[in-house]
Amino acid sequence: LTIGSFHPEAREEDKKSVKKLLSLNKNFIESEVIMIADRFLQNEVEALPNFLNYLEQFKKQVILLSKSNEYETLEAPLRTQVDLKLLELFKNKGKFKLEHKEELEKIMYKKRMVDEYTDINIQLSNIAKKKKIKYLKKQDFLCDEENKICDAFTTDGYKIYYDYGHYTLKGAKYLGEKMYNMK
């Protein structure tokens, strides 16, 4: 599903196809709450009010999330700092210890790319206010500003991030529970 399909310059057939996808999607139909999370390129931010207007007819609670945190990667776009540390430990036949977790959480905080998205997040916040929908800053549940760390692992020790900004299944479940408990 692409929010950009609701951009004023989008092709009409793209809008129709997205609307059809939604109308046939069992998860969408049966849900009470719709959470909108995206990488949010500028054209998608511009299309968002039209998309929200379309969603109003379904009478569902809508929650808008800020632009996704992304993290600098090394060597390849699919290798996170976590991957590199685990690979280093594996090569050296080392064991993963608590201090490695703490070190990686600090590295994740330093490598997050949030300043680049300030303008887009301000626009998203303003759209949420105007539309009277809840707005959540991902930074609030991904990172701990006071301790300058970002979660790298679930409480069960699974990686949260697949790459620069996508979550693993275990990571998505962990973050969803964390978000739910924050209310």
PLM region spans:
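Extracellular glycan-modifying ectodomains
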Residues: 1-183
